[in-house]
UniProtKB/Swiss-Prot annotation:
Keywords: Seed storage protein, Signal, Storage protein. This is Kafirin PSKR2. Residues 1-21 form the signal peptide. Major seed storage prolamin. It comes from Sorghum bicolor. The keyword Disulfide bond does not apply. InterPro entries: Seed_Storage_Prolamin (IPR051529), Zein (IPR002530). GO terms for molecular function: nutrient reservoir activity. Belongs to the zein family.
């Protein structure tokens, strides 16, 4: 009998413990849910685990950054672009005097510099830009070299000649003289009289003032065999050849023959 009473008490105690274990958590969560609706959101956070608190703070910070107004970001980017534009204008104003002087001194170099600034490849990689320009010029250079090797070599020497940059007229005169000198040397070997004649030609006033009279005079001098044999006699025999065209010789031949002798005696 006593054992039955003891078993009933034990069963009653177990039933009470199970009911409290199930009911108490349900009753304990209800006040927290109700209180969290009326209290600030930071109040229940204080009862949470520290790791969970840090995670929720990180999420709140990320949401605040993502929810930043787009207009503010756009305003910052426009301000940055404005600063860059002002800096570029200041640099351009600094370089404008130098560019204007370059345009007056060498227009070709100025245009090349303008094209260089507008080429994105030149801004990124100057070596690649120079190689590209060289590839564009190489076909034309190869064609010139195959068609006329002498002109190609002259063009290469022209690029590295300081006389061309300093004085183009003196360079052209020098080139003409170098081209004429071989012909003059051959003429001096073959016909010394003609060579002396070409040397005296720049100093002849008649050839400069009246070319027709000078040519007529030369044709008359060629008829005389003495002049062909000895060009130095041309100065003395030249008036004799022009006697038919001299009015003094027609009026007084004796005085015409005497006049050069008197002149030479005076000299």
């Amino acid at each position: 009998m006593a054992t039955k009473i003891f078993v009933l008490l034990a069963l009653l105690a177990l039933s009470v413990s199970t009911t409290t274990a199930v009911i108490i958590p349900q009753c304990s969560l209800a006040p927290n849910a109700i209180i969290s609706q009326f209290l600030p959101p930071l109040t229940p956070v204080g009862f949470e685990h520290p790791a969970l608190q840090a995670y929720r703070l990180q999420q709140a910070l990320a949401n605040s950054i993502l929810q930043q107004p787009f207009a503010q970001l756009q305003q910052q980017s426009s301000a940055h672009l404005t600063v860059q534009t002002i800096a570029a204008q200041q640099q351009q104003q600094q370089f404008l005097p130098a560019l204007s002087q370059l345009a007056l001194a060498n227009p070709v170099a100025y245009l090349q510099q303008q094209l260089l600034a507008s080429n994105p490849l030149a801004l990124v990689n100057n070596a690649a830009y120079q190689q590209q320009q060289l590839q564009q010029v190489l076909p034309m250079i190869s064609q010139v070299a195959m068609a006329n090797p002498a002109a190609y070599l002259q063009q290469q020497q022209l690029a590295y000649n300081p006389l061309v940059a300093a004085n183009a007229a003196a360079y052209l005169r020098q080139q003409q003289l170098q081209q004429i000198l071989p012909a003059l040397s051959q003429l001096a070997l073959v016909n010394p009289a003609a060579y002396l004649h070409t040397q005296l030609l720049p100093f002849n006033q008649l050839a400069v003032t009246n070319t027709a009279a000078y040519l007529q005079q030369q044709q008359l001098l060629r008829v005389n065999p003495v002049v062909a044999a000895n060009p130095l006699c041309a100065a003395f025999l030249q008036p004799r050849q022009l006697l038919p065209f001299n009015q003094i010789s027609l009026m007084n031949p004796a005085f015409s023959w005497q006049q050069p002798i008197v002149g030479s005696a005076i000299v």
